[in-house]
């Protein structure tokens, strides 16, 4: 009976805490727009933080399927599917590549949307980094999932262009794939 009281007291103590703290990896709109010069480096670092997970599959998606790399034998690694030309839909490495790519695109696009240009040269330089990151990600996504540009860029399918996060994610429409030229 004593253990039940102790557990009940511990449960009440845990639930009754009124301290509200935001996760360290998130920034609310008020903090972001109140002082852009202080919040911009943190937001941009968030983009680069996603690239840590993204960079490993980035070069593998492009190089393993080509003839630049030769691996002898077999492997159980998910990227071995690229070398053997047998991709499966549940390849977790491809899923991570796709997910983190669009996380970088969303973060960079939201920064571009929320922070005005022309405020200072430092802000414009950092906005340029956001434009670059978004373009670089689309390039690598198109390289991994799209058709070659040299064949027919007007009709070859590229990637869905999603610049930002939707205001209403529940009713958001998924975009069509754009062409490689777009």
Predicted regions mapped to residue ranges:
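Bacterial Sec-dependent N-terminal signal peptides
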Residues: 1-26
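Membrane-proximal, proline-rich intrinsically disordered regions
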Residues: 17-62
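Short, surface-exposed recognition loops and adjoining beta-strand edges that mediate ligand/DNA contacts
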Residues: 29-30, 34, 58-71, 147-155
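Secretory-pathway/luminal and periplasmic proteins that interact with or process carbohydrate-rich
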Residues: 52-57, 71, 137-148
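Short alpha-helical hairpin
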Residues: 64-89, 161
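Conserved, well-structured interaction surfaces
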Residues: 79-146, 174-178
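Short coil/linker segments at helix-helix boundaries
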Residues: 144-182
């Amino acid at each position: 009976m004593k253990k039940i009281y102790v557990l009940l007291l511990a449960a009440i103590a845990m639930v009754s805490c009124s301290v509200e703290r935001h996760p360290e990896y998130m920034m609310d709109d008020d903090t972001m727009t109140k002082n852009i010069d202080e919040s911009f480096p943190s937001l941009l670092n968030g983009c680069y933080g996603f690239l840590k997970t993204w960079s490993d599959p980035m070069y593998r998606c492009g190089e393993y399927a080509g003839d630049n790399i030769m691996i002898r034998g077999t492997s159980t690694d998910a990227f071995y599917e690229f070398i053997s030309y047998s991709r499966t839909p549940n390849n977790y490495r491809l899923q991570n590549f796709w997910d983190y790519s669009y996380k970088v695109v969303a973060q960079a696009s939201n920064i571009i949307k929320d922070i005005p240009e022309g405020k200072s040269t430092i802000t414009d330089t950092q906005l340029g980094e956001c434009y670059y990151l978004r373009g670089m990600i689309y390039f690598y996504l198109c390289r991994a999932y799209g058709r070659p540009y040299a064949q027919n860029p007007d009709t070859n399918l590229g990637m869905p262009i999603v610049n930002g996060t939707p205001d209403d994610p529940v009713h958001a429409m998924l975009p069509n794939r754009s062409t490689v030229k777009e």
